[in-house]
Amino acid sequence: MIKKIISVFLLLACIITLAFTAFFYHSKLSDQTKSISSLSSQQAQERLQSYQDSLDFYKKLNTSLSVAIANSLRDKAVEELNAIALRIQENHGFIGVTFASLDGTMFTDIGTLDWNAKTLRRDWFVKTVELGTKHYTAFDIDKTTGQHVLTIATPVYVGNDIVGSVALDIAGDQIASPNGSGMFMMTDRNFNVFASDLTHSTLIGKDLTKEKPLFKNLVSGQYVTFSDADSHWFAVSQTEIDGENKLFTIIDIQQIVQTYKRDIQLIIAGFSGFSCVMLIGLYWVLSKELSGVRQIREWILALSDGQIKERRPIKFHNELDTIAQSLENLQFRLLDVVRNSHRTMNDLSIKQTDITYSIEGNTNNSQQELGLIEQVATATTQLSCTSFDVMQQAQSAELNAETAQKLIAESHDIIDSSSKQTEMVTLSIHESQQIINQLREFSDNISSVTDVINNISDQTNLLALNAAIEAARAGEQGRGFAVVADEVRSLAVKTQQSTIDIQGIILKLQEQSQLADQVMTRNVSLIHETQVANRALIASFNLISDKVLEISNINSIVSTAANEQKIVTEDVAKQMEDIRYLVQENLSAMERTKQANQNISDLTTNLNDALSFFKIELTS
């Protein structure tokens, strides 16, 4: 028990220590972040101020030069201007010093150049000379020296007139001096380094993102920490310059990191020591307060072995006294329970014997009832089957009657349809007979026409003969006419022969028309007889349909009665089955009751055996 309490206390102490350490860690981390941000911001501001001061100085210097050389530039004093440019370049270490006249001539520290700023439209020349404004460019890489160069240009006035321009080419590391405290790097918009402190001077002219990939994703106003090969910690931040250039400020945070680690270690050590002291004190208190647990444990073990005996009261002067008193009360209660249980078990054994006899009598009666119910159920089932057979036969007869009635109705429809078709055939035959009569009349008309044609051909033949005779009389002059007359007579003969053929055909046509008329008349008579037979057949089918309908109605009544009888017998059979089920359930319940009673007897015996476990020892 003491081990468990100490383990729980130790666990709680660890949790509290971890929680406080996490809180302190977060607090210190926040302080560290603020310190680093403050130092980075301060150093960046100092470096920006130094950069701006240098820029302002060179702007003022440029303005002073524009005043000093105004007259010389107006007069184009070549040697004097070149000498001044060289002296300024040597004194200040500029990349180049250029004086441009109004026509674009350029006087530099290396002499007068052979190209013209006005002709080439140099940006600094255009803005200072033509627009009259001061101008300084962004840092660009000089093609000659490879250095980043910033050009500052100022217009030169004589009175109110512009006579030229002064341009100073200043190296990047000259504006951003490597001297001073703190590490830094300045880059152009493409991350090319043009100025840095002495420590990082080797990076000048190189791409910072390739040399220091960590710096690429820096956001202005934030910082990133990193360590070198010697595990020395630094923090770097980025600041925008002039909207194009970037300033990377690096500060040494090794002391801040070491202070942070030391504070965390002190907190952990302090809480660990405090937890150990508390653990020792807790063990001493628990050992003293729980000294009586051993005696109570022995008492409980004796009760668990069934030993119930009187004990003298034990006093521990703490909460264990309540436990000891409760154990003493429990012992007295157990004694009463054991004695009462023995008496109850004896009475229960007697009652269970009586229950067993009653259950056996009820079981025998229920079995007899079950046999009688099964006989009634069997008879009811047979009656239900008979009713079902009658109902099926009646339904089958009714279905056959319905089928016959449908067939009769279909036959009736067919006969009606046949009668209608017969009437249509009769009408068609009448129409055909009329057409044949007309055809016979037309053939008679044609016969009269052929008679006319025959007469014409006879006359034509006669005329042709007369013409031939007259042509013969005419001699040689009538020979041509004789040929024509022969041809006409030949045509008349052919016409006469065709007329005879047509008359033969017309005669045959008239004979066939008369024969067709006779056949049509005979068909009309036969169709009339068929219609009479169809009407008689329809009357017979109607009579059969009525009889079949009566049979169907009788079958329907028989089927309904058989179905109702079947439903009643099935209901009786179902009721008998329910009664049989209930009787079986009663038998099962009695069997279960009997088994439960036997189980109770066994449990009573077991309980007596269990109660014998308690050994009662009473002092006199």
Swiss-Prot record:
This is Toxin coregulated pilus biosynthesis protein I. May function as an environmental regulator of TCP biogenesis. Negatively regulates the synthesis of the major pilin subunit of TCP (TcpA). Belongs to the methyl-accepting chemotaxis (MCP) protein family. Residues 344-580 form the Methyl-accepting transducer domain. Keywords: Cell inner membrane, Cell membrane, Membrane, Methylation, Transducer. It is found in: Cell inner membrane. GO terms for cellular component: plasma membrane. It comes from Vibrio cholerae serotype O1 (strain ATCC 39315 / El Tor Inaba N16961). It is a peripheral membrane protein.
